[in-house]
């Protein structure tokens, strides 16, 4: 069985550590939206919706080649009150004793439960159930033909398959592989850790890790 983001079987994360202010603000909005899911998406058929968020936070590691760009990003974080903290690579073990500081010049993280990851399947079902209760109709089937529709804006819900329906829209699937890893030591409180020097990330999942 293929695991795809479009099918709700992939990894879905919630963060505010972006470079652009617009993305930071979107991250802040999504946090409030997710916190209100139990009340805002409650329905008769789904009285207790949840996204099962794990608020372990984000830890991003930067080598000398990426550090300057991240220092600029931190100015936007501060302006947007993103709650991001910054430490030197040499200080890493004071906060995260299980992280190697080798090759790391600086690191940013959050420790106020504002970042983490969610269950995409539960979130999708909560949105779908609420839409149905509000009158939306879901029809299963394949698109066989298209006709011209005049509109100021169109939202494609076809995900990575958009190009199969609308050839002039440059949206294509991109492979993203996630591995489940077993390690001798389990650190359940570990944040999602992204090493920008290697492109590798990892986070706890149950008693294992996803990477």
Model-found features: residue ranges?
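Single conserved hydrophobic/aromatic residue that forms the stacking wall/gate
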Residues: 2-13
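Active-site substrate-recognition segment that forms the wall
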Residues: 14, 36-37, 42-57, 158-211
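Local beta-strand N-terminus motif with an aromatic residue
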Residues: 9, 42, 151-152
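Mobile beta-alpha loop/short-helix "lid" or hinge segments that flank ligand
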Residues: 89-102, 209-210
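Helical element adjacent to the flavin cofactor pocket in flavoenzyme catalytic cores
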Residues: 110-144, 149-152, 157
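Glycine-rich nucleotide phosphate-binding loop and flanking beta-alpha elements
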Residues: 67-68, 124, 145, 161-163
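Dinucleotide-binding Rossmann-like beta1-alpha1 core, especially the glycine-rich loop
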Residues: 14-95, 199-201
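Alpha-helical scaffold segments in soluble metabolic enzymes
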Residues: 33-36, 72, 126, 130-133, ...
């Amino acid at each position: 069985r293929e695991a795809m983001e479009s099918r709700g079987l992939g990894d879905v994360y919630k963060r505010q550590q972006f470079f652009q202010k617009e993305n930071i603000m979107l991250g802040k909005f999504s946090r409030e939206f997710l916190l209100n899911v139990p009340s805002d998406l409650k329905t008769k058929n789904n009285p207790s919706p949840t996204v099962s968020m794990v608020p372990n936070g984000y830890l991003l590691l930067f080598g000398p080649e990426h550090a300057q760009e991240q220092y600029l990003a931190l100015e936007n974080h501060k302006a947007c009150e993103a709650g991001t903290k910054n430490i030197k690579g040499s200080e890493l073990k004071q906060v995260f004793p299980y992280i190697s500081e080798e090759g790391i010049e600086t690191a940013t993280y959050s420790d106020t439960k504002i970042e983490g990851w969610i269950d995409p399947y539960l979130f999708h079902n909560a949105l779908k159930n609420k839409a149905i209760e509000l009158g939306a109709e879901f029809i299963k089937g394949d698109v066989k033909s298209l006709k011209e529709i005049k509109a100021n804006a169109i939202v494609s819900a076809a995900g990575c398959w958009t190009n199969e329906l609308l050839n002039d829209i440059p949206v294509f699937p991109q492979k993203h592989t996630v591995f489940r890893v077993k390690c001798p030591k389990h650190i359940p409180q570990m944040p999602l850790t992204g090493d920008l020097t290697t492109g590798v990330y990892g986070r706890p999942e149950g008693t294992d890790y996803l990477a």
